[in-house]
Structures are given as C-alpha cells and as structure tokens.
Amino acid sequence: MDSPEVTFTLAYLVFAVCFVFTPNEFYSAGLTVQNLLSGWLGSEDAAFVPYHLRRTSATLLCHSLLPLGYYMGMCFAASEKQLYSPGQAPEAWQLFLLLAVTLPLLSCTLIYYWSWDRWTRHPLAQTLALYALPQSGWQAVASSINTEFRRIDKFATGAPGARVIVTDTWVMKVTTYRVHVAQQQDVHLTVTESRQHDLSPDSNLPVQLLTIRVASTSPGTQPFDIRLNSSEYGELCEKLHAPIRSAANVVIRQSLGDLFLETFASHVEVNPAYSVPSNQELEPCIGCMQTRASVKLVKTCQEPAVGECQQCYCRPMWCLTCMGKWFASRQDPQRPDTWLASRVPCPTCRARFCILDVCCVR
C-alpha cells in the first residue's frame, strides 16, 4: 500500500474505533451520535423510552455507514485504483463496496421493521410489553419509566456506553445498541465477580469493579450484568428494594478507606523491618486492643536531620490496620491523590512521619 493509503487507513481506523467505543475526548468534542442527531433524538430527560428507541436505531445506522465512509475516503486516498468507478476497481474492492452498501440497507430494513406500528417491534418495546398489565400496552410501562427517570433521586452511574440507572421501580442498563430493563419487585441480584484495578484516572488508589447479575423472575426476560465501582455499592443498595447476594469468595471493598488501607499495608510491607529488642514485649494495640502492636515509626525516608519528617521515639503501640486508619483520618477526603505522599503526626508523640517511615515489627 502507498503512504496515503496507509495514513488514511490508520486514521480512519482510529476514528471508527473511537466513534463506536466513544472515549471522553470524543464526548467533549461532541462527536457522538447523541450529539450529532440531538435535534431528532429529542431530550432523554423529557422522554426516556422514546429517546432510546430512536437513539439505538440511529446508532445502528450510523455505525453501519462506517465501511461505506472508508470506501469513499479511499476514492481520494488511492485515486489510482479508480475506486470512484466500481466497474474498473479491483475485485476485492468491489466486494468490499458490496458489503459497505449492504450493511446500511440491512440496518434501514431492520429499523423500519422496529418502527412499524409505533415501535412495537423494537426490542425495548417488546421487553416493556412483558411487564405490561393485560388491559394496557407497553406504552403504559414506558410512561412509568419516563416519569421515574425525571426524578432527581434516581441512581445513575457508569460510562455513556454502559450506564446503570435505578429508579424506584426499575433497574436499567443502557448500552450502545440496547436498553435492558427489569422490574425491582421481580429481580434477584447477585455479585458474581469483583476485579481489582491498580490504576485509577482520579487517584493513586486501586479501584474495585463489581459485576452484579440482574435476573428477573418474569417469564420471557433475559438476565443481564451491570458493573459499577465498589465505592458506589452502598448507594446502589439504598435505592434497591431487594437485597444483593454475593457469590462465594467475592469480597466487596465499599469505601475509599478500605481501598486505602490495603494500599497502605502493601507499601508498609516493602519498608525496612524493625527488630524489637529481646527484652521488650509487644503489648496489645492501643487503638483496637484486639491484636498485638505490629508497627514502629522509624525515620527511613531521609537522613535524620533532613526533611519534614521527624524521628519518633515511641515504642511499638499500634497495629498496622489502626495506624493505617489514623493515617487516612488525617487526609483531605476530596484529594485522595495526595494521601500516599502526605505526612501526618504520630498519634502518640505528634512527630511527623510519612508512609516510608512505617516499619513492620519483626
């Protein structure tokens, strides 16, 4: 391939991937189906269900046009191939053009089928029909969802391509091409998986992501999974009427403090150990009185007379967990990215120390 072809192909590939799996930069620039077609889609707050009936259809059509857009761009990037004249183009490109034209035609056919009889055949409308009373239709269920979505007390989280919304009556997951819906009174929720991620875009602390299986007892409904940060788990439980069960061996760390304590302990473990004199007996931790003292503050971050940290002369009096809780209690909750690098006073003598000065007792 010539250089213009390679350049255009790589650039278009990046654009297509970002347009389908939209990053924050594309949202900020307004390069989304929701923003480009906002005049036709209407307002999500005003009419949640009609908005997503149109949005899912428009998204399917726009994404199906991407191969055709690539072909049209290659007409200029590789003009010597005469792609603008399909009859003279190479056979491989003729097949690609056939595929590029077929995809939008199939999408239009499917969208027309969905929209027939006021969107009754759309997957979202068919799901809502499962919850409709015998004397009413799916539109009555849609009206209920529209009303509850407008309330400010709903729970909403997640990226635009995988949003989780919980209202007083409904549990919903909004994805690129579908909207999953379940009625709260009929669902069983189970935490099936928890994953720890060491990197967070907002702080130096690890992030735990939970996967919750939402299974409805209503006939004909399909279960779906929702994912959220463990720090939002408590807020989700407050909005749900049904309890959430946990699968075996799934540990949920709900608070920022829980995540920090784990990170604090992992950092302390790699610090130099402190050897207790043979004639000194370790006493119970004065913080919890449940375990023996297990840490000693020893200035190891810098030379004794250098820096802000000070030497602590207290004997081992605290366990690792209580020292971590003390360290966290002295931090700004709005600035978790500064916690690990900060300095706090010793809880006993007030000598300032950092995390590098906390040594495990051996």
Curated annotation (Swiss-Prot):
Superkingdom, taxonomy of origin: Eukaryota
Subcellular location field: Endoplasmic reticulum membrane
Segments passing through the bilayer: 7-27, 57-77, 95-115
Pathway info: Protein modification; protein ubiquitination
Topology class, membrane: Multi-pass membrane protein
Cytoplasmic membrane side: 28-56, 116-362
Keyword Zinc-finger appears in the UniProt entry: yes
EC number: 2.3.2.27
GO molecular-function term, one example from the UniProt record: zinc ion binding
Enzyme class: transferase
Membrane-side (Lumenal) residue stretches: 1-6, 78-94
GO cellular component, one term: endoplasmic reticulum membrane
Catalysed reactions, semicolon-separated: S-ubiquitinyl-[E2 ubiquitin-conjugating enzyme]-L-cysteine + [acceptor protein]-L-lysine = [E2 ubiquitin-conjugating enzyme]-L-cysteine + N(6)-ubiquitinyl-[acceptor protein]-L-lysine
InterPro entries in the cross-refs: TM129
Zinc finger (RING-type): 285-350
Keyword vocabulary terms for this entry: Endoplasmic reticulum, Membrane, Metal-binding, Transferase, Transmembrane, Transmembrane helix, Ubl conjugation pathway, Unfolded protein response, Zinc, Zinc-finger
Subunit structure: Integral component of ER-resident dislocation complexes.
Protein family membership: Belongs to the TMEM129 family.
Summary of the function given for this chain in its UniProt record: E3 ubiquitin-protein ligase involved in ER-associated protein degradation, preferentially associates with the E2 enzyme UBE2J2. Exploited by viral US11 proteins to mediate HLA class I proteins degradation.
Name listed for the protein in its UniProt record: E3 ubiquitin-protein ligase TM129
Source organism phylogeny: Eukaryota, Metazoa, Chordata, Craniata, Vertebrata
Gene symbol of the encoding locus: Tmem129
